[in-house]
Every structure is written in structure tokens, then in C-alpha cells.
């Protein structure tokens, strides 16, 4: 795999009229909190009330106190917002949110980008909530400038980024030489760059799209980030990685805590993520570079990736390490549906012998369907360089026209357990293709005998409800039902739909119970 670098706007202006039309009343701050209001028609010398609002978000950020809520009226705000004042655990967060059903837009059109900078940024602050904004049009054509839609940096805790729409954040410079390894743009970025971590961060319900990222990522947690939840986001149509959990890039002062960790990546939908035609990936190849992951863990640890949909990307999900002698570890990938990705469904291990390893990870109860669509023979599961002590169980893998199911082109592969999976391929059991420790085997039986893998696995049609319509629930007669290995320590409590994970005699194979 070739990789270069990191893979109606205005609401009603009269609240009473809105209530008369049946709109919900605006939310209220807690009894101990204070309410402030900002409007494009306001003035920063006003009182900051609903009747006499401020004009700028920055004035509100410089004034708000712990436990307060800044209600932002609909309209366009063409200024950056830098939040450095904190809420508190006792009084509550400082919350910046849209007013009622109105949509405030923070628009970066014409604004300069200074080094690495967020259109909205939270620097060394804690107990902050940013909710219900559209954040857009923050761009540059200058190398070494990094525009970010929402940027959280330094240290802090108790930060929530909720229900925001982030789009058209771009660096359109054409990289050359060493610039291929640089950072270019992000939709949402969390960089733990201090000895104290960024902890307790929630990124939920956001939409990120039309981002020109170069060698960077759509949504990323990097460095000293400890305890995070990336949930229920929609990430699509961007030119590099969708969601990334990163370690060992030198973001934090010490390697000892330079890993995003103790995280949850759940309920996200990620699609149309591709590095093809991205100049940061060098000369365009005949089939494209196909190096951008929908969901990626690069050096992170102790994280669960579950109940996500990842499709029409270059790679569905990857757990790997780009840094030699460093490992991505203790990642559980379970109950995800991964389909129609160009190179492979799930990848693990370093992408060449100069990279790091994947160790002590679990890939369980996923449904992988017809990935490997562009003829690169990545199969449904791509086992790369230096994989150790990983568990791969209870997965459905249905091959594309390539007929490749598992592709492992490296001999440095020790202690991995592969069993209780269900496989299917257009060429049938005898014509299915497998590469294990760099040796090609044709046919399921030949692969089992030669490798010792999959002694309890099946080769059969999984009988999806409607695969043409991408409904990967199981028909009542599916051989995957009750055919898995019920290890409650790793399969999780719920399937892709949030239903109890075990309902019959044993767990089903695949994402659907």
C-alpha cells in the first residue's frame, strides 16, 4: 500500500412569534447559571440579554462565567472564536449553543490562517460545550498553514463538541518534497500537547464533509488524549482519513503519554473517504493511491470501535502503527458493517517493514462485504507487517470478484488466533483465495490445512436480507445464526442495532444478532 504521510439560515427574530408558531421554547440555563445572547444585529456594549444582545462571539467568550450559557442567534458571524476561559466541575460548563431552532454560522471566508489555527479553537480550557453551529469556509493556499474547523489543543477536561456541521475547511496548496509529510487541514482536531492530558472529551452528532485535508484527517484525536468518545458522527466526501486515533507523532512532550487512549468510536457513519487525486499522496497511480481509511487507529491504544458503518472508502477500518518499534495495542473492533471499500475491509499491522506493529487487538463480530473493489487484492481482511497476539473471530467475510478473503503478505505474524468466522466468495469454496505468511492458497480447505486457522469456521452463503440494498441483517435460515464463539469478554453487549448481543444458544457470526 502506497502511503505518503498521514494518510434557511436566519431564524425568527422575535421569540414570541416563534412560540406562536409552535416552536419549542429556548432552553434555559441552570438556576445557578447565567444566560447571555449574541446576535449579528447586536452590539458588544449591550447588556448581553435576549432583548439587548452582544454582537460577537469573542466578546461572549471573554465574558462568560462557569455554568453560563451563550445563546447564539441565527445568522452569519465572519470572525474567529478563541475560547480560553474555563467552566468548572462545580458550577458547570460554559456552553455556546444555537438559540431555539435557529442556525448560527461561523464563516471563515476571507479570514487569514496563522500557522495552525481553528476557526473555533479551545486552548488550555476545560468544561466547554460547543453545540449546534455551522462552521465553514476556512481555507488557505499556503503551505505550512493549517486551518481547522474546531481545534482543541493543550490540556483540559470536560469538553463537548455536539451537533455541529463542519465543511469546506481546506488547504489547497500543492505539496512538494518533504511537504508530503506535513499537516494541511482538519475538520475537528484534538491535540493533547501538554504533560496534563485532554480528558473526558465528547465529539457527538457532528457532520464533517467537503474537506481538503492533504496529509491530515477529517476528525482526529492525537497525543496526550485520555478518555474520549467519538460517537454518532457523519463523516463523508473528504480527501483523507475520516476518523483517526493517533500516537507517537511527538505531539505530547513525552513518548510515555504521547498516545490517544481509553476511547470509544461508536455509531459513526463514514463514507466516500479517498486519497485518490489528493496531491499529498504523490503521483497518481493507475488505480489511485487508495490509502485513506474510513476509521483509523495509528498508534493509539485501549479503544473500542463498534457499531459503525464504513463504506465506499479506500480502506474501511485500519488498526496499525506507522512508527517503527511502536505498537497499536488493545483495540477492539466489533459489531461494525464494512462494505464496498476499494482496497480492503479491515487492515492491521504496519504497511511496510519500516513501520510498527498491531498487538493484542480483537476483531470480532464484524460484517465485511465485497471490499477489495479495485483489483489490489486487499481482500476482506488485510494482515500486514508485524501482527502479534490478535484475535479474529465471529466475522462474516464475503469476497468481491477478486475472491480474496484474507491477504497476509508478511511472515512476521505470530500468536494470532483466527477462528469461528463465516466466509463466502463468488468462486465458491474451491476457488476462494487466501494468502497467509506470504504463501498463496487456493480453496478454503487448502488454506485451513496449511495454516491451522479457522478450524471451527464455515464457508457458506451468509444469507443477508437484501445485500443489493445493503441490508446486512441475517435471514432466519442464515448459517451464521448461533454459530459464533460466545466470549462475553470481547463480543460486547449489543449488536450493530443496539440489540442484545446474545439471544440464542450462542452468539451469531457477524454484526447482526
Question: Model features per residue range: what roles?
Answer:
Residues 1-12:
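Bacterial N-terminal signal peptides that target proteins for export
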Residues 17-28:
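C-terminal segment of classical bacterial N-terminal signal peptides
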Residues 28-58, 76, 100-102, 462-468:
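Right-handed parallel beta-helix/beta-solenoid
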Residues 40-78, 82, 447, 478, ...:
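Acidic Gly/Asp/Thr-rich repetitive segments characteristic of extracellular carbohydrate-active
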Residues 58, 62-66, 78-95, 104-131, ...:
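Extracellular beta-strand-rich solenoid/capping regions of secreted or surface-exposed proteins
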Residues 77-82, 108-119, 139-148, 170-186, ...:
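Short glycine/acidic-rich loop motifs that flank beta-strands on beta-rich extracellular proteins
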Residues 93, 97-103, 126-137, 157-170, ...:
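Right-handed parallel beta-helix
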Residues 444-513:
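C-terminal accessory segments
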Amino acid at each position: 500500500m502506497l502511503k505518503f504521510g498521514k494518510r434557511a439560515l436566519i431564524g425568527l427574530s422575535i421569540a414570541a412569534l416563534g412560540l406562536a408558531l409552535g416552536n419549542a421554547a429556548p432552553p434555559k440555563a441552570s438556576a445557578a447559571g447565567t444566560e447571555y445572547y449574541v446576535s449579528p444585529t447586536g452590539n458588544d456594549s449591550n447588556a448581553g440579554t435576549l432583548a439587548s444582545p452582544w454582537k460577537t462571539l469573542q466578546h461572549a467568550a471573554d465574558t462568560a462565567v462557569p455554568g453560563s450559557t451563550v445563546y447564539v442567534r441565527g445568522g452569519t458571524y465572519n470572525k474567529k472564536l478563541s475560547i480560553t476561559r474555563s467552566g468548572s466541575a462545580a458550577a458547570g460548563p460554559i456552553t455556546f449553543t444555537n438559540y431555539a431552532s435557529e442556525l448560527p454560522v461561523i464563516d471563515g471566508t476571507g479570514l487569514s490562517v496563522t500557522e495552525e489555527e481553528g476557526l473555533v479553537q479551545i486552548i488550555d480550557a476545560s468544561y466547554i460545550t460547543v453545540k449546534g453551529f455551522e462552521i465553514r469556509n476556512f481555507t488557505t493556499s499556503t503551505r505550512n498553514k493549517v486551518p481547522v474547523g474546531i481545534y482543541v489543543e493543550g490540556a483540559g477536561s470536560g469538553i463537548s463538541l455536539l451537533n455541529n456541521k463542519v465543511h469546506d475547511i481546506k488547504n489547497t496548496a500543492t505539496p512538494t518534497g518533504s511537504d508530503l509529510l506535513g499537516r494541511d487541514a482538519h475538520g475537528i482536531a484534538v491535540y493533547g500537547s501538554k504533560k496534563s492530558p485532554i480528558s473526558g472529551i465528547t465529539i457527538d452528532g457532528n457532520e464533517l464533509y467537503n474537506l481538503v485535508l492533504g496529509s491530515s484527517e477529517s476528525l482526529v484525536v492525537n497525543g496526550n488524549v485520555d478518555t474520549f468518545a467519538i460517537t454518532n458522527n457523519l463523516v463523508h466526501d473528504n480527501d483523507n482519513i475520516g476518523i483517526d486515533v493517533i500516537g507517537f507523532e511527538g505531539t505530547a512532550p513525552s513518548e510515555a503519554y504521547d498516545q490517544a487512549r481509553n476511547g470509544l468510536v461508536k455509531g459513526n457513519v463514514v463514507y466516500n473517504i479517498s486519497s485518490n487525486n489528493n496531491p499529498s499522496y504523490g503521483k497518481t497511480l493507475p488505480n489511485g493511491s487508495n490509502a485513506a481509511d474510513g476509521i483509523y487507529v495509528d498508534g493509539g491504544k485501549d479503544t473500542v470501535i463498534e457499531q459503525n458503518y464504513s463504506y465506499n472508502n479506500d480502506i474501511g477500518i485500519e488498526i496499525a502503527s506507522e512508527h517503527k518499534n511502536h505498537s497499536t495495542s488493545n483495540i477492539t473492533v466489533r459489531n461494525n458493517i464494512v462494505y464496498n471499500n476499494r482496497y480492503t475491509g479491515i487492515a492491521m499491522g504496519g504497511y511496510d517493514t519500516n513501520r510498527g506493529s498491531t498487538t493484542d487487538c480483537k476483531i470480532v463480530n464484524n460484517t465485511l462485504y465485497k471490499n477489495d473493489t479495485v483489483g489490489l487484492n486487499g481482500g476482506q481482511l488485510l494482515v500486514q507487517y508485524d501482527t502479534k497476539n490478535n484475535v479474529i473471530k465471529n466475522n462474516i467475510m464475503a469476497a468481491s470478484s477478486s475472491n480474496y478473503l484474507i491477504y497476509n503478505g508478511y511472515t512476521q505474524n505470530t500468536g494470532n488466533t483466527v477462528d469461528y468466522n463465516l466466509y463466502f466468495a463468488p468462486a465458491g469454496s474451491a476457488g476462494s483465495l487466501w494468502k497467509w505468511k506470504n504463501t498463496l492458497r487456493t480453496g478454503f480447505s487448502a488454506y485451513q490445512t496449511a495454516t491451522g486457522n479457522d478450524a471451527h469456521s464455515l464457508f457458506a452463503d451468509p444469507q443477508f436480507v437484501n445485500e443489493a440494498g445493503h441490508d446486512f441483517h441475517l435471514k432466519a435460515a442464515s448459517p451464521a445464526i448461533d454459530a459464533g464463539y460466545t466470549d462475553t469478554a470481547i463480543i460486547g453487549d449489543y449488536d450493530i442495532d443496539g440489540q442484545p448481543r446474545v439471544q440464542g444458544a450462542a452468539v451469531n457470526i457477524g454484526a447482526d444478532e
